[in-house]
From Swiss-Prot:
This is Trifunctional UDP-glucose 4,6-dehydratase/UDP-4-keto-6-deoxy-D-glucose 3,5-epimerase/UDP-4-keto-L-rhamnose-reductase RHM3. One of its GO terms (biological process) is UDP-rhamnose biosynthetic process. The gene is RHM3. The active site is at residues 133-134, 159. It comes from Arabidopsis thaliana. PANTHER family: DTDP-D-GLUCOSE 4,6-DEHYDRATASE-RELATED (PTHR43000). The keyword Membrane does not apply.
Length: 664
């Protein structure tokens, strides 16, 4: 196996816990490498973490944000960076529930900025993306084999969902642009320098001050812990020996219950566990277990060197010698911290009076009055985004027809302040999001405009969802079903459709990747109704966005059955769904499938008797398009149960499209 040797390494988030240990190790061990570290210095970063490297001639610190494209491009070019180790991220699960959008900005958008800079400069020989074991989701309690690197990603919280989303972007840039990427997924790390929002430093600081150790629930939750220096060595191995386009778990199969960790720390301080452990209310999002398979990395020569007892002792000694390293962290030491300490500000989750752990200082946080309230009896008024789009325009016409007051939003989806201004001025009962980038003339546009696509389809949609959540507003979100493709479990012609709970399996186009990513993240919002639209069709056969109009103008057509959405029938249903306060994910297609040839046969029979077309296969189609297209059948049972009067796709085509346009 060839050993990779970098020259100039950029380490993001390097003033944080794990990255600082990696940076210090590389600076110390490889004086011929230039190490440039970038960090915006938020609440869990500390320049003192990099003290061992400050005087080294091969070390350079830059304060800045990875979301700044100009800064990132400047650094890559001026420092002649050939290797990136991307650690920068928001990582605390609890905080992700209180301010998930901040996690999207940091973990997804920031990663995308980095990737785009790599593509533009064209000089990166290794991009190591640091992810988490939490992307695999919760492991069964009785599982004897850990998640291996090819396991399905099933994140269960906003933090892990954003990390999984970032991984998808990294994979996309590896495949689309040949960027030499490597991804790591690590389990819990402990040791010196860690901000005490995490379990072990939190327990150590509490024990040092004679405070109770709070256990969420019964303490049976299981975690695997690696000492920080062992993890730093793992990254050293991945840097030099890791294979491009591979994923490596950094973990251990040795597991410990939270109650066992509390017992061990109590014993280190000579405290009776029975008197110091305090059982508190469990967190509703406290996964029971994460378990990794660690064999792949071991084959590169890495192994865990520090046993639990030694690592815990070293960690305790460091915190007792450096009790003021992080300053006043009393807010983080509470059993259920109310403070969400995100960069730039401190956020509270309610209007209340709180006390620091020592009981001395108090402060009051006041939550502003919500612009909307789901429990009131206001009449309907819709706020619609997507005025210039096809669906947005049709929604406005439907509102006029039904006598429903509505206004179009003036704000841009990615501009939070403008969305808040819209809601305050319009005071809607519901918000409809029909805005988004699909590309003109088709989704191939998104392949060359990825930053714009993610800004609107991911960051923008999540911003609107979060603003609506803060104002107790239901958001009707027009999404896409083009995130699936026929597979072994859902073969073409079988009648087995993809259900609402199924995870996307189509990543052929960047457009679909962004839509799959945002759908996964929106699962965490209980105020969103996601409508999976597919190949939309309307009675307006002159509209270039109409699927029938599109295929009738193609020189050749692939004949394959698909689920589709007849807008004349289903858009009124979306309004009724808003009235019924329906939420969650819905396959927003007419029941059944129709092939492209069947549609064109109807077109010929009803509209243009002399119409002719020819077919070609998917392989031939691939030669004339940039990105592959999604073909699938969606399961319509959920929507049909709610609206049993809904017509099948073929009957709806005839009633709403071809009969009204029939030429005599």
């Amino acid at each position: 196996m060839a050993t990779y040797k970098p020259k100039n390494i950029l380490i993001t988030g390097a003033a944080g816990f794990i990255a600082s240990h990696v940076a210090n190790r590389l600076v110390r061990s490889y004086p011929d490498y230039k190490i440039v570290v970038l960090d915006k210095l938020d609440y869990c970063s500390n320049l003192k973490n990099l003290n061992p490297s400050k005087s080294s001639p091969n070390f350079k610190f830059v304060k800045g944000d990875i979301a700044s494209a100009d800064l990132v491009n400047y650094l890559l070019i001026t420092e002649e960076i050939d290797t990136i180790m991307h650690f920068a991220a928001q990582t605390h699960v609890d905080n992700s529930f209180g301010n998930s959008f901040e996690f999207t900005k940091n973990n997804i958008y920031g990663t995308h900025v980095l990737l785009e800079a790599c593509k533009v400069t064209g000089q990166i020989r290794r991009f190591i993306h640091v992810s988490t074991d939490e992307v695999y989701g919760e492991t069964d309690e009785d599982a004897s084999v850990g998640n291996h690197e090819a396991s399905q990603l099933l994140p269960t919280n906003p933090y892990s969902a954003t990390k999984a989303g970032a991984e998808m972007l990294v994979m996309a840039y590896g495949r689309s642009y040949g960027l030499p990427v490597i991804t790591t997924r690590g389990n819990n790390v402990y040791g010196p320098n860690q901000f005490p929002e995490k379990l072990i430093p939190k327990f150590i600081l509490l024990a040092m001050n004679g405070k109770p150790l709070p256990i969420h629930g019964d303490g049976s939750n299981v975690r695997s812990y690696l000492y920080c220096e062992d993890v730093a060595e793992a990254f050293e191995v991945v840097l030099h020996k890791g294979e491009v386009n591979h994923v490596y778990n950094i973990g251990t199969t040795r597991e410990r219950r939270v109650i066992d960790v509390a017992n061990d720390i109590s014993k280190l301080f000579g405290i009776d566990p029975d008197s110091t452990i305090q059982y508190v209310e469990n967190r509703p999002f406290n996964d029971q277990r994460y378990f990794l398979d660690d064999q792949k990395l071991k084959k590169l020569g890495w192994c865990e060197r520090t046993n639990w007892e030694e690592g815990l002792r070293k960690t305790m000694e460091w915190y007792t010698e450096n009790p003021e390293w992080w300053g006043d962290v009393s807010g983080a030491l509470l059993p259920h911290p109310r403070m969400l300490m995100m960069p730039g500000d401190r956020h509270s989750d309610g209007s209340d009076e709180h006390k620091n752990a020592d009981g001395n200082q108090t402060f009051t946080v006041v939550t502003p009055t919500k612009a909307g309230c789901s429990g009131d009896k206001r009449s309907l008024k819709f706020l619609i985004y997507g005025k210039t789009g096809w669906l947005g325009g049709l929604l406005g016409k439907l509102c006029e027809k039904q006598g429903i007051p509505y206004e179009y939003g003036k704000g841009r989806l990615e501009d939070r302040a403008s969305l808040i201004a819209d809601i305050r001025s319009i005071k809607p009962s519901h918000v409809f999001n029909a805005a988004g980038l699909t590309g003109r003339p088709n989704v191939d546009w998104c392949e060359s405009h990825k930053t714009e696509t993610i800004r609107v389809n991911v960051a923008g949609t999540l911003t609107l969802a979060d603003v609506c959540r803060e104002n107790d507003l239901l958001m009707m979100n027009f999404a896409t079903g083009c995130i699936f493709e026929y597979d072994a479990a859902h073969p073409e012609g079988s009648g087995i459709g993809f259900k609402e709970e199924d995870k996307p399996n189509f990543t052929g186009s960047f457009y679909s990747k962004t839509k799959a990513m945002v759908e996964e993240l929106l699962r965490e919002f209980d105020n969103v109704c996601t409508l999976r639209v597919r190949m939309p069709i309307s009675s307006d056969l002159n509209n270039p966005r109409n699927f029938i109009t599109k295929i009738s103008r193609y020189n050749k057509v692939v004949n394959i059955p698909n689920s589709m959405t007849i807008l004349d029938e289903l858009l009124p249903i979306s309004i009724e769904m808003a009235k019924r306060n329906l939420r969650g994910i819905w396959n927003f297609t007419n029941p059944g499938v129709v092939s492209h040839n069947e549609i064109l046969e109807m077109y010929k029979s009803y509209i243009e008797p002399d119409f002719k077309w020819s077919n070609f296969n998917l392989e031939e189609q691939a030669k004339v398009i940039v990105a592959p297209r999604s073909n699938n059948e969606m399961d319509g049972a959920k929507l049909s149960k709610e609206f049993p009067e809904m017509l099948s796709i073929k009957d709806s085509l005839i009633k709403y499209v071809f009969e009204p346009n029939k030429r005599t």
